[in-house]
């Protein structure tokens, strides 16, 4: 049997960012509108600093207005909420993203609830979650949106396909299931209490792994020819024992990739699969929010 097609999320995301950049230039020339994204970072978490740096660079490369607010680790919740209120009222800012995790003195739920739903480019606000659940226009969480784009690029029409989403988080699992339902797939959401999870997975034409457990989904769980989207990003010890003993790590997904690629029809690698799509879809949401703020229809050719 031939090996699975490797779904190149990095290349797809680069193409999407290029098309977003062209749409931004059109907004600038036709409407004098420049989409603006504000990212808020509290503290000095190294991973968060890298994420914020990458987001800022890609926002500027797309021709958007980019603002980063770096706050000290001892920032109070009241101070952060005050900043969010200012960003909500700023007409040059169309998207607001607060980088998680936050320090323990700050309640992330209260912070996310304070963001104007029309500027909630992460798509985490309960208003946007509700809009997605009932099929109304809103801002969709970036990672599930990116997964849907990759799926439609590989499969085309998802109508009638059996999709299994392993994981039920508010960030990936639940919104992913809603997007698949809207695409007319038949959807099962599996989780830690699912009985005979391997058998459930084997029934999937489309398998989305979003559990945060390294290589939990084995090759024997996958139906021959299935499309596998691996959302997991997990750090595990390096393969080389000496490197592992020195604290070196490697990144793996939630799927045992080497096993799965001999069975699946197509699969996303980790890294280089879903990850690059997340920031690209953040830019897409910022563009969408900017268009809606002025009553402009977002470009249809950018949406899945």
From Swiss-Prot:
Key words of the record: Amino-acid biosynthesis, Histidine biosynthesis, Hydrolase, Methionine biosynthesis, Multifunctional enzyme, NADP, One-carbon metabolism, Oxidoreductase, Purine biosynthesis
Q: Which domain of life is it from?
A: Bacteria
GO MF terms listed in the record are: methenyltetrahydrofolate cyclohydrolase activity; methylenetetrahydrofolate dehydrogenase (NADP+) activity
UniProt pathway = One-carbon metabolism; tetrahydrofolate interconversion
Q: Which family does it belong to?
A: Belongs to the tetrahydrofolate dehydrogenase/cyclohydrolase family.
Q: What is its EC number?
A: 1.5.1.5, 3.5.4.9
List of residues binding NADP(+):
167-169, 192, 233
Q: Does the keyword DNA damage apply?
A: no
Listed GO CC annotations: cytosol
- Catalysis performed (reactions): (6R)-5,10-methylene-5,6,7,8-tetrahydrofolate + NADP(+) = (6R)-5,10-methenyltetrahydrofolate + NADPH; (6R)-5,10-methenyltetrahydrofolate + H2O = (6R)-10-formyltetrahydrofolate + H(+)
Give the protein's recorded name.
Answer: Bifunctional protein FolD
**An example of a Gene Ontology BP annotation on this entry?**
purine nucleotide biosynthetic process
UniProt key word Hydrolase: yes
Q: Which gene encodes it?
A: folD
Oligomer status and interactors: Homodimer.
């Amino acid at each position: 049997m031939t090996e699975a097609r490797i779904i190149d999320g990095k290349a797809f995301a680069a193409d999407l960012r290029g098309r977003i950049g062209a749409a931004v230039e059109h907004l600038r020339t036709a409407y004098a509108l420049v989409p603006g994204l504000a990212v808020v970072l509290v503290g000095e978490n190294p991973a968060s600093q890298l994420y914020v740096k990458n987001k800022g660079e890609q926002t500027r490369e797309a021709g958007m207005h980019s603002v980063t607010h770096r706050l000290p680790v001892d920032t109070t919740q009241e101070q952060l909420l005050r900043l969010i209120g200012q960003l909500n009222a700023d007409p040059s800012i169309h998207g607001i993203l607060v980088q998680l995790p936050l320090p323990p003195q700050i309640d992330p739920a209260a912070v996310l609830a304070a963001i104007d739903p029309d500027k909630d480019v992460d798509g985490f606000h309960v208003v946007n979650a509700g809009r997605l659940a009932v099929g109304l226009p809103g801002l969709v969480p970036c990672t599930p949106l990116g997964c849907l784009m990759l799926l439609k690029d590989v499969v085309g029409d998802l109508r009638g396909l059996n999709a299994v989403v392993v994981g039920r988080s508010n960030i990936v699992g639940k919104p992913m299931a809603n997007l698949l339902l809207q695409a007319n797939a038949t959807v099962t959401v599996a989780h830690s209490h699912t009985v005979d999870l391997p058998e459930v997975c084997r029934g999937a034409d489309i398998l989305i792994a979003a559990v945060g457990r390294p290589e939990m989904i084995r090759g024997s769980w996958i139906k021959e020819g299935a499309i596998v989207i691996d959302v997991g990003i997990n750090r595990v010890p390096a393969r080389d024992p000496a490197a592992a003993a020195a604290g070196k790590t490697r990144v793996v997904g939630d799927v045992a990739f080497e096993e799965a690629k001999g069975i699946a029809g197509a699969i996303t690698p980790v890294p280089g699969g879903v990850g690059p799509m997340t920031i690209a879809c953040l830019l897409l949401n910022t563009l969408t929010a900017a268009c809606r703020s002025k009553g402009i229809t977002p470009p249809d050719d950018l949406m899945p």
